[in-house]
Amino acid sequence: SGSGGAAGADYIIAQGTTGKWMWRKWASGIAEMWATFDAPSLTMTSQTWGPLYTASWMGLEVNKQAREYPFAFIENPIVSATPTVGSGNIWLATNTENDIGTRLTHAPAYQCVRGSDAIVDSPQISYYVVGRYK
């Protein structure tokens, strides 16, 4: 086979950085974008969800605004969110009280959850979003 790629291969028609988001638009109508949201630390010392400890920085206005996508999708995109921390184990749960916009225009908010109290060091939520923009 040749080095020119397969017939009908998709290709990037635009890419850039908007706020926290890096993004690519593909000729086929698919778009992908990714961003990270972090905090220096997160205090999780109160049981806020039954026996579980939860906390989030997604309610901060700066984070609400930054979760707006650089452009809207035309159908609900696939959103992957991955937590990482400097120390203190967590998992993620939805945080709908801090959602704004729609699934087409904004990344969803998440909260950090754990089974015991802690101050979590350097929590970060990394988003990867893919869907149709046209």
Enumerate the predicted regions with their spans.
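Glycine-rich, low-complexity segments
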Residues: 1-42
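Extracellular attachment/recognition segments
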Residues: 28-134
